[in-house]
């Protein structure tokens, strides 16, 4: 193995992967998917708290989806980062927006609340929440979960290929993150459970080394 290839295989990145803050539609239990909704005051407060936890992390790059709730979340994190505060405005990190980091496209469900979905699509709604192996996104003109996962993984691949080392902040969405968490545990896309999504404004840290994503031991801060 040549030296350059060996260095590339042994490189180590830290990925701080975060779900956006709570939005108005989160609070109303509406499917957002690839539509957007504004952050709530409670959502902003949580992001600021998370920003304080990460205030002494020197980020090399910041990636978000194309949706406003992730962009707004990332901007608040950077506003509370001590390294960014010291920089001249023009030298501060710029957000890199990737469509691959977008949320699952939920088709006809987007903008509808959970109760409405169960009334209009009782069988598919039941399958999505309680029997996802039988969920068929095509029936609601949406994106299949496995396709959304592959899209998200392609976005992560871009990120790790563009960054040799350092700390990277990635702000994305609940459903694609749940799919990713299952993926690194060697679970299938149809092991997805909407009820287990990471909380709004919360994050997990992954080390990327030798082509693998490894979640660091995570202790919940009280």
Residue ranges of predicted features:
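Loop-to-helix element that buttresses phosphate recognition and phosphoryl-transfer chemistry
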Residues: 22-72, 140-152
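Extreme N-terminal starter segment of soluble prokaryotic enzymes
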Residues: 10-16
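Residue-level preference for the first positions of well-ordered beta-strands
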Residues: 15, 165-171
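Short glycine/proline- and acidic residue-enriched helix-loop micro-motifs
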Residues: 125-147
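GST superfamily/GST-like fold recognition
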Residues: 174-178, 202
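Phosphate-coordination/substrate-recognition cap region in phosphate-metabolizing enzymes
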Residues: 10, 49-126
